[in-house]
């Protein structure tokens, strides 16, 4: 394998190992393959990947229900960490040799990955590259849907469904670090305990308790100001039941289905807002603005220890299928990562 060298003398091979989706299907369709190392375009960096985070959208892409946006790599993986080894034209904020963690448009399950320079962030102080790889996708998602679209304001209370998921553990810690009351739902006593250890004021076991009634009780009848919901389906009318007047429901996934029956009179009378978003199709400029907001508002909180990494298990790149099996089982608490080694 011939290696090319950039101007700063970091050798980059022509070929790399990647995980391909051989056909739409279950975890078994993920296969190790060889591909050409991508070249950074203007405004992009090439990262030698140390680790890649594993997320639900990766599983959806593998199953054939969440196609990459036009121009994005068909290799799964939306967040990585590693070392910058090549720069596209116009990149000035990073230099070759810098360590970064980054949101990617795809291609993270690989030894090398390109991404816009503005989507990179420095690994937090004291965090390993594997730990840093699990930050971008969930932190971008929470920032957009809780703090921007959900408009979580000082004094507001947040309810997070799926509190023990990667999104959940990020939302708990981000909101608590900024001084908010946080309630969550989770499906076992172990998961509820883990959420409370991370800062949730109360974790509600949705298998044994009515979360809507419990949230109303915990807030003296007021309800939550913002709800982050990745379940959808029949959770939505229950969400509205425990939203405060002028409350905001932010939908980010539909693990419980895409259809719900609502009492729209309740929406009007109590001035409720229902919003939602997906991250991957958003523009480079939008994601860069989110990265800048995270670096300004959240990174200082991480650096002083108010937010900590929560990794349940790591796998090698060759065992990506096992990582997908685990995340789809719902047994994990926190994040799952692939250690690539770059």
Protein language model annotation of sequence segments:
Residues 178, 234-307, 332, 339-342:
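Glycine-rich phosphate-binding loop and adjacent beta-alpha segment
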Residues 108-111, 186-194, 211, 259-264:
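Short, glycine/polar-rich helix-capping loops at beta-to-alpha or helix-loop-helix junctions
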Residues 133-209:
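Mid-domain Rossmann-like dinucleotide-binding core that forms the NAD(H)/NADP(H) cofactor-binding site
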Residues 95, 125-128, 151-157, 221-222:
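Short helix-loop-beta connector
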Residues 36-54, 65-107:
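Glycine-rich beta-strand-centered segment in the early N-terminal region that forms part
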Residues 104-117:
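A structural motif shared across PLP-dependent enzymes of the aminotransferase-like
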Residues 211-221:
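Short amphipathic alpha-helix with an adjacent loop that forms part of the alpha/beta core around
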Residues 5-16, 299, 304-313, 321-342:
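C-terminal capping/lid region of NAD(P)-dependent oxidoreductase domains
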């Amino acid at each position: 394998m011939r290696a090319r060298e950039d101007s700063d003398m970091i050798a980059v091979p022509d070929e790399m190992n990647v995980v391909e989706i051989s056909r739409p299907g279950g975890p078994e369709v993920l296969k190790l393959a060889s591909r050409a190392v991508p070249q950074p375009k203007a405004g992009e960096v090439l990262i030698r990947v140390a680790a890649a985070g594993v997320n639900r959208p990766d599983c959806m892409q593998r199953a054939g229900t969440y196609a990459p946006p036009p121009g994005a790599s068909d290799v799964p993986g939306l967040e990585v960490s590693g070392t910058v080894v090549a720069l596209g034209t116009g990149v000035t904020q990073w230099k070759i040799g810098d360590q970064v963690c980054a949101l990617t448009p795809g291609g993270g399950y690989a030894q090398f990955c390109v991404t816009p320079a503005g989507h990179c962030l420095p690994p937090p102080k004291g965090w390993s590259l594997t730990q840093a790889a699990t930050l971008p996708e969930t932190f971008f998602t929470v920032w957009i849907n809780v703090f921007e679209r959900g408009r979580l304001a000082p004094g507001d209370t947040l309810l997070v469904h799926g509190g023990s998921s990667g999104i959940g553990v990020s939302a708990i810690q981000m909101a608590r670090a900024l001084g908010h009351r946080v309630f969550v739902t989770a499906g076992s006593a172990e998961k509820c305990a883990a959420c409370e250890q991370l800062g949730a004021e109360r974790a509600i076991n949705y298998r044994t308790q009515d979360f809507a009634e419990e949230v109303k009780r915990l807030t003296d009848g007021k309800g939550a100001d913002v709800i982050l919901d990745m379940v959808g389906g029949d959770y939505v009318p229950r969400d509205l039941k425990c939203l405060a007047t002028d409350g905001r429901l932010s939908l980010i996934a539909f693990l419980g289905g895409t259809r719900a029956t609502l009492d729209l009179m309740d929406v009007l009378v109590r001035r409720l807002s229902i919003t939602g978003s997906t991250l991957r199709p958003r523009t480079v400029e939008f994601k860069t603005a989110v990265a800048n907001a995270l670096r300004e508002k959240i990174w200082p909180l991480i650096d002083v220890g108010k937010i900590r990494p929560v990794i349940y298990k790591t796998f090698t790149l060759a065992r990506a299928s096992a990582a997908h099996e685990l995340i789809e089982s719902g047994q994990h608490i926190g994040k799952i990562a692939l250690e690539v080694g770059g």
